[in-house]
Swiss-Prot record:
InterPro entries, per database record: T2SS_GspM (IPR007690), T2SS_M_periplasmic_sf (IPR023229)
Role noted for this protein: Inner membrane component of the type II secretion system required for the energy-dependent secretion of extracellular factors such as proteases and toxins from the periplasm. Plays a role in the complex assembly and recruits XcpY resulting in a stable complex in the inner membrane. Provides thus a link between the energy-providing XcpR protein in the cytoplasm and the rest of the T2SS machinery.
Gene: xcpZ
Protein name (record): Type II secretion system protein M
Residue spans crossing the bilayer: 33-52
Species of the source: Pseudomonas aeruginosa (strain ATCC 15692 / DSM 22644 / CIP 104116 / JCM 14847 / LMG 12228 / 1C / PRS 101 / PAO1)
Recorded domain comment: Two distinct periplasmic domains, one located in the proximity of the transmembrane domain and the other located towards the C-terminal part of the protein are both involved in the interaction with XcpY.
Family membership: Belongs to the GSP M family.
The keyword Coiled coil is assigned to this record: no
Length: 174
């Protein structure tokens, strides 16, 4: 406690002898009061600009995001019966699980894709690694497979140059 008291006394002595303190005491009382009010005003302005406005902007963007997400949720809920109905009505082409490897290889070649590696993962499942190819060719091929009853269980895509991707896919018969 004694150390703190001594430190406080030294600090006060230095503050009283500093140039700024001497100039402050030399000002008329009215000027000191005006400077105190100006300092308080500037402190409020800084607090408003540094804390309040950014928080207000963040709150506004969060409200907008929430509104957009609520609208998206309502749209999804509204469209869910249509999706279920369309899914139930869509005929699924059934393929023989044993013929999956040949079908994947043939359809990939037809789509202009080169199969780098094809591993059998058991009954009705294969793992495919494709050489880099345009993404625009890969997507229609996957849609074609889906239409034939082949589901993409896992997909790993690595972006290459010029819109090309290399893909690692786990495919299985639905």
């Amino acid at each position: 406690m004694k150390v703190m008291t001594q430190f406080h006394e030294r600090l006060r002595a230095q503050a009283e002898t500093s140039q700024l303190a001497i100039r402050w005491r030399g000002l008329p009382a009215r000027d000191r009061l005006a400077l105190l009010w100006l300092g308080a005003f500037l402190l409020l302005v800084v607090l408003y600009l540094a804390l309040w406005r950014p928080a207000e902007r963040h709150l506004q963007s969060a409200r907008q995001y929430f509104t957009e997400q609520r609208a998206l949720h309502a749209y999804i809920q509204q469209q869910a019966p249509n999706v279920r109905q369309a899914d139930a009505a869509a005929p699924q082409a059934q393929i023989d699980p044993a013929a999956l490897q040949g079908m994947v290889t043939a359809s990939a070649a037809q789509a202009g894709l080169s199969v780098e590696r094809l591993d059998n993962e058991g009954e009705g499942a294969v793992q495919v690694a494709l050489q880099p190819a345009p993404f625009a060719k890969l997507l229609p091929w996957l849609e074609q497979l889906n239409g034939q009853g082949v589901q993409v269980a896992e997909a790993g895509l690595d972006r290459q140059v010029d819109g090309r991707v290399s893909a690692r896919l786990s495919l299985r018969v639905e």
